[in-house]
Every structure is written in C-alpha cells, then in structure tokens.
C-alpha cells in the first residue's frame, strides 16, 4: 500500500478550505494546507467582512439624520476615511490570525505559500520547492475579480484594491450591475462620494427578482447614485490627477477612481490542473460531481473555484460535508442549492430565498403572488423616503411557499429563518396562521393578503 505524507492536502485556506482541513484533522486525519495569500481567503480579507464593516460605516449618516425626529440634536459629523481603514485593518489582521491559530490548534500543518499539482497525489509548494504527497487533495482556491478588456483598463481597480485605497474617492465610477457593484454604490454614496454606476445591461441584479431589482434602482437613485444602463467603457485615460472615462454610448466625464465589478473568475492559474488531469469548463471552473469529486478520483474541489453558488456559507458547508464524509464516516445531505438564502447589503438591504417570480411561473401554472410596499414606523416617524418591499410566491396547487423576496432594513436577518421554513416545505397557511409580532416590519410578512 502506497504511503503518503498526508491523508488530506488542501490548497487554499479560505472559509471552505480551512473548515475542511480543521474538520478532517479533528476526525484524526493527517492534514496539510497551503495558502499563498492570506488565511481566511477572500471573505475575511477582501470580501464579506471588510465590505460589511464599510456598509455599517455608510449607514451612520442616516442614523444621525433621523436622530432629530427622536429628540437627538447631533452635532455635525465628519467622516475620517483613514480611521475606518485603520480600524478595519486591525480587525482583518485579528481574524486572519484566528484562522491560522485554529488550523494549528486542530493539528493541521500550514504552508504559507502557493501550491501546484504535479499529479493525482502530489503537490509542489512553489516558494520552497518542497514536494508532498496526499491520499486526497482538496482544491479550495476561490475566485478573483474579472477585468474586462478595454484601453486603459490597467488604470482601474477591483474590490481587491478598494479596501486599501489611501484616500476616499470623491468621484467614483462603478462598472457592473451585480450584487457587489450595488453594495459598493450604496456604501460610497452613504459615505458622501459622488457615485456613477455604469451597467452593461438594461437592469440591476441579473438573476434576482425583477421587482426587487427595480425597487433597489429607485432607492439607489434616490440616494444620489447616477445609474447609467446599456453602456460600457470604451476608453480610460489619465488626465492629471483624474481619470477621463469615454463610453461606447458617447459619454465623457472625469472621476477619481474606476472600480471594476463585473463578476469573478475561478482561481485556477498555476494550479497544474492540466498536468493532474483535472477537467475545467469553458468558464475555467473545475468540473465536479457529487461530493465535489473532480474528474480525478483522488482530487476534489469546493467553493467558488467550482462556480456553482459562490457564497461563503456554501463553501463552508461543502468543506464540512467533505471531511465528515471521508474522515468521520458521517453522511451529510447534499446541499439544496435552490434554497440557499442570499442577502445584498445595500441600504436598504435585500434578502431572498427560493425562486424568482419568472422562475416560479415556469414551474407552477397556478402561482399566487403576494406583495406589499410600505414605510416602517421608524421610517415614517423620521420622515425617511425609504420603503420596505415584500413579495411572497405561493404554488396555489399545494399552498407551498416557493419564493420570498424582501427589501428593507434588517431583512437579511429575517431571510435566514424564512429559509428554514421553506426548507421545511412550509405552506402559506403555516405563515399566515402564525401570530404576528408587533410592532415590526416582519409582521407584514404573515399578514399579507
């Protein structure tokens, strides 16, 4: 029987890879993990965590403004970009050290360098040149921001660089209409920047419910975001300290910073996939079957590098299930990707689970659509023009709720528990027979008619 250095070797110590490594080690496996950038991966260092901290910061002006209606006479506030960035960096450093400490505490051997596959069971560490073998190899290298091709694209930045800008851009162009793009549009508008958003298509948030996307468009416009649809950059040039943007639609204007938010691509460069025989699709994503198995029997992949559903909790669940199955003898049910809750941290934020209305109409001929639009008690009292929008989709034949789409303050917290109800095949009768909690915006969900 062949002897290996490790039972499992993980490439990538982001949320999914780190979870898989720790769980396997706790089950008694000999585990190694390589990370060429930062422990914690995109989410901790260049994604979810720093972005959410900036979302919190961007909402402070609203709280100050509405405070007057509640009797608070707040003095004029001044935003300090460097203070936020410094505090953010301290928190990210803390979380990264927690990730590495937890891996070491579980008995995982860490290698702070990139790794390349040599064959089905062998990995070479790029900096040191060390070669290690493993019975199984798990690829969890995530994804990276895509960069569209146009003259001057090198003058633009992605979300990777955004979190390290030395100054707040006073004039910001965001290219893209997906959830990351609209989140940053809301953040920088809230922080006082002049924001223009350039969207290639006719609407925001492709893949989300049409009414949710349109309602968000209204709110972003109301908050001062200049939304430009069906246009793209033709040329980007440096003009002194500014950038000159020329679009295919004939627009020309100056900004301080151009942020590219046009999607993400699987991180496969330098992995040696071809040498190992691992198949990728036309988008560069690793092709996997049940349990994350690739076309090579000893090599597996989880998370964004597989381009199935690119969310941190999905990668974590996939990593947990992988190690439980192979090293703990525990069979976890396959993830139901159709019922994964999703949040968009705009202001107001979005929470969705299940089918969109257009998707539901393809599956359910008798679809009941319940929706409401209102201002919350706090919004009305403070004179805010923000609104709450709820939409529930019900299959009339079975009374089962097949989709819930929410926009409003705090709905990301709500959608987590609504997802539990949909996972349990809750009916609309289950929802409306539940006594409402008053006064909340959530009560409107169970009193919809």
Regions found by a protein language model. Give the residues of each.
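N-terminal Rossmann-like dinucleotide/flavin-binding domain of flavoprotein oxidoreductases
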Residues: 1-4, 23, 43-46, 50-131, ...
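Glycine-rich dinucleotide-binding loop and its adjacent helix/turn
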Residues: 48, 139-194, 227, 274-276, ...
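Flexible, glycine-rich terminal cap/loop adjacent to redox cofactors
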Residues: 11-16, 20-37, 42, 49, ...
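Short beta-strand "acidic-cap" motif of Rossmann-like dinucleotide-binding folds
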Residues: 29-35, 139, 193-199
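FAD-site-proximal beta/loop scaffold in flavoenzymes
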Residues: 154-170, 252-331
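Rossmann-like dinucleotide-binding cores of NAD(P)H-dependent redox enzymes
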Residues: 90-96, 100, 163-164, 169-173, ...
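A Rossmann-like FAD-binding core segment of flavoenzymes
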Residues: 109-112, 116-125, 132, 191-290, ...
